[in-house]
């Protein structure tokens, strides 16, 4: 079956965003990543800046703090409002057109669809560190910290909203090591598997 929607979850520094962009170009389909922030903001009633900061990485706090966080009249926290708006936007995009969606728990949100290819991109530590130092102009020690913090928050968010383990192979159709395969080969494999 042809896969109209490709979700790409990724470790920080693995090149998942770049690979996703290239896949979308190759297939001639839409690419969604940070460009859906305004749609999420509109649906949630929050500012695009707040959504940008919190959509994929919330909840930042522990469960105790989350339990006592501010709530709206329905009892939902701000993090829950962002997540719910994000879920609605992703479902709308999947109905609207073939596309590549980066992160945002899209693999889980779209898990009941047959036309979705769920991909997880990971990489070897030395390669990810090199990429982060080059792109973010930081030293190796800072790159390791940024990578660890980001992956921890991505994993926490995924687990919190899906009750699944982020990066666990059984949650995805395809898991690719971008360090071992290279970006071009990852792109080609994803394109081929989508047909």
PLM features: what roles do these ranges have?
Residues 2-11, 97:
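Pre-Walker A (Motif I) flank of P-loop NTPase domains
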Residues 8-21:
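Glycine-rich phosphate-binding P-loop
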Residues 30-41:
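Short beta-strand-centered segment that lines the nucleotide-binding/catalytic pocket of NTP-utilizing
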Residues 41-98:
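ATP-dependent small-molecule kinase phosphotransfer cores
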Residues 59-66, 139-184:
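Small-molecule kinase domains that catalyze NTP-dependent phosphoryl transfer to phosphate-bearing small molecules
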Residues 87, 183-191:
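Short, amphipathic alpha-helical "lid/cap" segments that border enzyme active or binding sites
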Residues 93, 106-112:
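RNA pseudouridine synthases
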Residues 112-134, 140-148:
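Conserved phosphate-donor/acceptor-positioning beta-strand/loop module used by diverse small-molecule
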């Amino acid at each position: 079956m042809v896969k109209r929607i490709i979700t790409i979850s990724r470790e920080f520094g693995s090149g998942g965003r770049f690979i996703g962009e290239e896949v979308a170009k190759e297939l001639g389909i839409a690419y969604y990543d940070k460009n859906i922030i305004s749609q999420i903001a509109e649906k949630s009633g929050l500012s695009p800046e707040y959504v940008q900061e919190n959509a994929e990485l919330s909840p930042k706090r522990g469960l105790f703090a989350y339990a006592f966080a501010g709530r709206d009249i329905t009892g939902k926290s701000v993090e829950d409002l962002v997540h719910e708006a994000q879920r609605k936007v992703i479902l709308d995009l999947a109905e609207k057109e073939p596309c590549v969606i980066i992160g945002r728990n899209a693999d889980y949100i779209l898990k009941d669809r047959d036309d979705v290819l769920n991909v997880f991109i990971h990489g070897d530590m030395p390669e990810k560190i090199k990429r982060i130092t080059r792109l973010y102009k930081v030293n190796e020690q800072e790159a390791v910290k940024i990578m660890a913090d980001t992956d921890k928050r991505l994993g926490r968010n995924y687990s919190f909203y899906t009750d699944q383990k982020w990066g666990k192979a059984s949650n995805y159709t395809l898991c690719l090591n971008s360090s071992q395969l290279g970006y071009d080969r990852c792109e080609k494999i994803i394109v081929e598997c989508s047909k």
